[in-house]
Amino acid sequence: MCCFLLVSVLLATTLTDVASAQRWRQTSGGGKDRWDGLLDPLDADLRRDIIRYGELAQATSDALIGDPASPFAGASRYAPDAFLRKVRASDPDAYRVTRFVYATSSVRLPDAFMPRPAPSAGAAWSGESNWMGYVAVAADGVAANAGRRDIVVAWRGTKRAVEWANDLDITLVPADGVVGPGPGWTQPSVHRGFLSVYTSKSFSSPFNKLSAREQVLAEITRLLRAYKNENCSITITGHSLGAALSTLNAIDIVANGYNVRGSSRVPVPVTAIALASPRVGDDQFKRAFDSTPNLSLLRVRNAPDIVPTILPSAFFKDVGAELLVDTRRSPYLKNPAGPAQWHNLECYLHAVAGTQGAGDGAGFSLVVDRDLALVNKEVDALRDEYQVPAAWWVEKNKGMVQNASGRWVLQDHEEGNLAM
């Protein structure tokens, strides 16, 4: 009898694990239908997943020092240790940051892409590099519950996207080294600026002797080796510019075999959650992306946001599947609003939490209980009756502290914030 009960328990556990794994493959777009039937109406598990990864992307914005008066403009305010706790992530212990990522560019970009210290700020931490995100890995408990070890790459976006959107050129260049020609497509081309941020290096900068691409790929390789005996997944996420970098990063990992480990040669699935993403590449890039196995991308687009469509569709093509949301349907937000609110990531996540479909008659209901105050972190979007000040996410006293002599000095970062 005891043996029978033990076998029954083991069988039930195995069936539960299998069902959980199958469900995860479905919500990560890994099934043959790639989110078909899960987007309208939005599946409950997928809704929570989008918000989870969106919050990991939001952490990059929350930590960025953007004030050009600071010598540390363009750097992270916090060190990797306890990073998600410092940015007040909703589940700060679910992932552990293992590496910061830095980028530079060999071509001229809009100033908003990479904030840098003003000449009057004094000795700058770097004149060439910017902190561009991080790599993290799921904690033991989270991995055990999920049945897999999730590796996340979170790419930083820009705080002033509506300013750079109209200053963005439309130059396409071959995506050499990232993705090449294949069965059914010729050499893909991608946006020159996005590719430059992803692949540029500078031997004069200690932060970019390796490109952002090389830093991320090296860390993914290291983590896959560290967890070689576990089921793993790779999730890439970002908002705005970060979403464009996520798109490049995701196909790069799969096209060049960085998701294949050991003698088993079994590929690790790669999923990108791209929020408010501009288009990245041409029709050949689209063919390559949408034809590559073990690669899925979900674009989340707010209907009135101009950034996802700013690059002309005659030259640039959307990739992956699309989840369309509309912040104008929320009864909690000011209406009319403007481009800054429509593009803001917290407003996006609010829309994901409440969307009831893309149809004309679809309503809005916050089925995920996200704090309304988050909407006003960086913008003035929440209706006045909720009594939440606009753009309230600021460092106390803007980073000014009183030293031992009683004088006020700028101390807007913690020790170790320039870790690699």
UniProtKB/Swiss-Prot annotation:
Stored PANTHER family: PHOSPHOLIPASE A1-II 3, PHOSPHOLIPASE A1-IIGAMMA
Family statement drawn from the similarity comment of this UniProt entry: Belongs to the AB hydrolase superfamily. Lipase family.
GO biological process annotation, one example: lipid catabolic process
Cell compartments where the protein resides: Secreted
Signal peptide residue numbers: 1-21
Protein name, UniProt field: Phospholipase A1-II 3
Superkingdom in the source lineage: Eukaryota
EC identifiers of the protein: 3.1.1.-
Annotated active site: 240 (acyl-ester intermediate), 240 (charge relay system), 305 (charge relay system), 343 (charge relay system)
Keywords recorded for this protein, A-Z: Coiled coil, Glycoprotein, Hydrolase, Lipid degradation, Lipid metabolism, Secreted, Signal
